[in-house]
């Protein structure tokens, strides 16, 4: 029968083995990119993983540790000089000789970023909307029934569909963001009034956009 002491020693051994395995995992492996990855590929991989594991969105016990690992990898690989050092010396380039990052590292200071910082480079909203808080962002992306407020619908109509959101840079974002309250239909109407033969007829031209398709038709009603 195992004694408490032997169980404790076994647990310590497992923990040490786990840490050794994690330590041997390269930053490229963490982000899931090849060593020859471009800056754009690295940035795209980071945003995808950061959104998946951010503690505010992912409530699993290991989400915070995973997110920190992802952020640390990105901090190094997104900087040309740091990446060059890492490619040459590996993890030892940023440790203090004890297997820990040096106290002078900027990682601790740069780690505490929020969703605004995470998405600001993606141009989700207009220029004025990039400065809005994380709560504002979450309110727009929560699942809502069709009876959402007109204010929220207005913002959805301002969503940028042209030449950016669904290109190769953001193809993963399209897959990750799905919510029932979203309708990519944008309508612009102009109403004109024509009178003839003593009757009144009201016509309006409706331009309707669904995805990348735009259709225009005239809707008339009257006596």
Curated annotation (Swiss-Prot):
One of its GO terms (cellular component) is endoplasmic reticulum. The modification Phosphoserine is found at residue 133. Residues 1-23 form the signal peptide. It comes from the Eukaryota. GO terms for biological process: B cell differentiation; ERAD pathway; negative regulation of IRE1-mediated unfolded protein response; positive regulation of immunoglobulin production; response to endoplasmic reticulum stress; response to unfolded protein. Its main location: endoplasmic reticulum. GO terms for molecular function: misfolded protein binding; protein-folding chaperone binding. Coiled coil: none annotated. Residues 91-223 are annotated as: Divergent targeting domain. Keywords: Chaperone, Endoplasmic reticulum, Phosphoprotein, Signal, Unfolded protein response. InterPro entries: DnaJ_domain (IPR001623), DnaJ_domain_CS (IPR018253), Hsp70_co-chaperone_J-domain (IPR051948), J_dom_sf (IPR036869). Residues 26-90 form the J domain. It is found in: Endoplasmic reticulum lumen. The J domain stimulates the ATPase activity of HSPA5/BiP, while the divergent targeting domain is required for efficient substrate recognition by HSPA5/BiP. The divergent targeting domain specifically recognizes and binds to aggregation-prone sequences. Interacts with HSPA5/BiP; interaction is direct. Interacts with ERN1/IRE1 (via the luminal region). Interacts with DERL1. Co-chaperone for Hsp70 protein HSPA5/BiP that acts as a key repressor of the ERN1/IRE1-mediated unfolded protein response (UPR). J domain-containing co-chaperones stimulate the ATPase activity of Hsp70 proteins and are required for efficient substrate recognition by Hsp70 proteins. In the unstressed endoplasmic reticulum, interacts with the luminal region of ERN1/IRE1 and selectively recruits HSPA5/BiP: HSPA5/BiP disrupts the dimerization of the active ERN1/IRE1 luminal region, thereby inactivating ERN1/IRE1. This is DnaJ homolog subfamily B member 9. The lineage of its organism: Eukaryota, Metazoa, Chordata, Craniata, Vertebrata. The gene is DNAJB9.
